[in-house]
């Protein structure tokens, strides 16, 4: 995965001495009141909330390998006439690049990383060409269709193997949309079929 962070860190400065420095292997955030230093090697997966308002701050939770949660707010200053997602997007892009690796998307069948977590599947990961959770799994070579489905608050990817008709159009596997699953599934379904993710149901506000 080509990464702009290979050329050096990206610095974002805000009001009240706020400073974010994002590197290819982690980041530091000084809010003016406290400082956070994170190495991506210590992180299992991320969760971002408060994204329903396009000009409000975000709450980023990073679940660390030691079981502790690292929580902080990003993009706390509204941006007139634009979507204030610069801090959030920069951190998530760097994290995704560190996880997917330099060879992405040519390493799909050799990736061995944790992707996310859900109540049903618990830990969801990809290893040896298989996306798997506690109850279900799917070979990436069998993936034929990926649909983005949103209700306005929660966005997930419905994953289908083959073209067979199914009851209530139930997917073979489902994962939350995040900075890892989006580029990963886009690369998989494009490689398999020449077509990317179906985003026609991705806007839950309409």
Question: How would you name each of these model-derived features?
Answer:
Residues 1-12, 16-22, 206:
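Short Lys/Arg-enriched alpha/beta "domain-start" segment
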Residues 4, 26-28, 63:
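Compositionally biased, low-complexity repeat tracts
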Residues 5-8, 86-87, 118-121:
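A broad, low-specificity signal for short, low-complexity segments enriched in glycine/proline
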Residues 12-53, 116-162:
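Phosphoinositide-binding peripheral membrane targeting modules
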Residues 44-115, 142-206:
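Acidic, Ser/Thr- and proline-rich intrinsically disordered linker/docking segments
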């Amino acid at each position: 995965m080509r990464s702009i962070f290979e050329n050096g860190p990206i610095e974002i400065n805000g009001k009240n001495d706020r400073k974010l420095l994002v590197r290819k292997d982690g980041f530091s955030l000084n809010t003016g009141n406290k400082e956070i230093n994170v190495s991506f090697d210590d992180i299992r997966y991320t969760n971002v909330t408060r994204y329903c308002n396009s000009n409000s701050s975000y709450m980023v939770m990073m679940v660390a390998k030691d079981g502790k949660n690292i929580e902080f707010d990003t993009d706390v200053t509204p941006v007139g006439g634009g979507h204030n997602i610069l801090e959030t997007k920069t951190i998530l892009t760097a994290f995704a690049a560190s996880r997917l690796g330099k060879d992405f998307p040519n390493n799909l069948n050799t990736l061995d990383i944790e992707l996310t977590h859900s109540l049903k599947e618990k830990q969801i990961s990809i290893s040896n060409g298989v996306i798997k959770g506690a109850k279900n799994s799917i070979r990436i070579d069998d993936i034929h269709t990926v649909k983005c489905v949103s209700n306005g608050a929660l966005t997930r990817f419905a994953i289908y193997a083959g073209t067979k008709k199914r009851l209530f159009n139930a997917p073979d596997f489902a994962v939350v949309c995040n900075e890892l699953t989006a580029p990963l599934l886009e690369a998989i379904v494009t490689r398999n079929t020449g077509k990317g993710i179906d985003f026609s149901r991705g806007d839950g506000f309409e």
